[in-house]
């Protein structure tokens, strides 16, 4: 055995030097050194280039950074502790804050301007024109930034590329009729009043028009209220639904094809019946056939009459007084203005006739009316063009800036449509949740779902949410208001449990559920229509009242008959896709038994001796193209 080293023998001068060199390389500084240094900060700071870009901060980090810049010191107060509950994260404004914001919006709405094209003529050179356009555009950007900073207002994300605004200027200059396409559920958010002023500034002979798309989501009374409002404001408004009109035109085509096939089959059946049956049987069957054909003709004529009936003749028992008032208001409105806003849903031919008849002054081109279509990307501008042309003339996309250049499309020799790139114009909103629910901001890029879902819970009643999705939302506690709207967590927990959207920890995936709910809200499955000003929003939602009456009526019928009451379920798109699948299969994880064998063992059946050696591996299926795939890849179409 060797001699055991003592504790002091292992540390020498050489080892101490090595340790010091290693510690110096690691940036270690000894505190017990005799060297005295001082940081004067009088040299060049080479570390200043190692900066980190900060685009978004939390409220605490922002507060501390501002305090550090201001040179303020804070002392911790340990006794003043305030607990903020989780329900306070709703992100919605109180009634006082919303009233204050509406007042600010009304006071500063004249400052919401779109950039103007500087005046130019034939003698202006392209270089000078581009420079003046850049200068005016920069001034416009500065004015909006100053408005947002000084008044503490939130503006919608607007187009910041000058080339897109140049396309708008060209469309306005060459158009005789400028049509703003807006969403009928919230027209005032998507309408830009300053655009109408700019059109009149370019030429007095140009005509402004408002096209309310997706108007099939509104009832007749809701459309009538908006028509009266725009009539008082002196705005020419037209109601239209590109999706409903496309479906109607497709149904007409299918109906014509079906009628042609029925006529051919009828002639074949008649010839066959003449050869195979007696004259008596022919006479006995003809009255029934004539009766059925007459009934079908009467039904079709009745439907045509109901569709083509004039608006003044639309009348029900509950609408007689309203129609009388409306009929009395018509002469006054037509006397004061040269047009009358109808609440009817226009068809394709009627819309084209409206485009041709709305302009009566001199046109930019002789014998041709040019209609410029302007609007947000998500309001159905491209769908309107495709419905008019009955084929895909324009690519449809929800991303702003998808169309790079304007294009002219001739519907007929005397009518030309000028498609403008989708522009997001500046407008006021209260919160970012309102922009998400209006479809302005993409849902898939949402970072915080709490404010948006809280707004949905505030707008959509509890019974509508439960009936639409077939869920049971937890009721309020005894110490809470029984009529309060559900919280975001209550809705998303119930929806996640029902759909099976679970996280790895066994909890409902609220973020995934929120995306499904918000997409249903934007598409109109969860319908909420904003009313005109000075109308109560709760009184402007007749679909919610009808939904509640339908549920209560079903409960009364079940209770009066003595039968056990059944839960009224409303089948939605998700249920249809799940329960009506053409190929239903079970998915498993892990290694399974194949033909009674497990890998590396014999038959599983007990009592039989494994006397014969199995040749090869019977559970292996070589050359099987239908191999087992991962479950997450098989169900990737179900991901949000």
UniProtKB/Swiss-Prot annotation:
Listed Acidic residues bias regions: 253-270, 290-304, 320-331
Residue span(s) of domain CP-type G: 165-426
Gene Ontology MF, one: GTP binding
Region (Disordered): 251-341, 602-640
Reaction catalyzed: GTP + H2O = GDP + phosphate + H(+)
One cellular-component annotation, GO: Cajal body
Enzyme's top EC category: hydrolase
Predominant place of localization: cytoplasm
Binding site for GTP: 213-216, 375-382, 419-422
Highest taxon listed in the record's lineage: Eukaryota
Gene Ontology BP terms: nuclear export; protein transport; ribosomal subunit export from nucleus
Keyword Endoplasmic reticulum belongs to the record: yes
Basic residues bias locations: 618-640
One Pfam family recorded for the sequence: MMR_HSR1
EC number: 3.6.5.-
Chain intervals with Polar residues compositional bias: 332-341
Subcellular location per the Swiss-Prot or TrEMBL entry: Cytoplasm; Endoplasmic reticulum; Nucleus, Cajal body
Keyword annotations: Cytoplasm, Endoplasmic reticulum, GTP-binding, Hydrolase, Nucleotide-binding, Nucleus, Protein transport, Transport
Domain-related comment: In contrast to other GTP-binding proteins, this family is characterized by a circular permutation of the GTPase motifs described by a G4-G1-G3 pattern.
Function field: Functions as a GTPase. May act by mediating the release of NMD3 from the 60S ribosomal subunit after export into the cytoplasm during the 60S ribosomal subunit maturation.
PANTHER family named among the record's database cross-references: LARGE SUBUNIT GTPASE 1 HOMOLOG (PTHR45709:SF2), LARGE SUBUNIT GTPASE 1 HOMOLOG-RELATED (PTHR45709)
Similarity comment: family membership: Belongs to the TRAFAC class YlqF/YawG GTPase family. LSG1 subfamily.
Name used for this protein in its record: Large subunit GTPase 1 homolog
Species annotation: Danio rerio (Zebrafish)
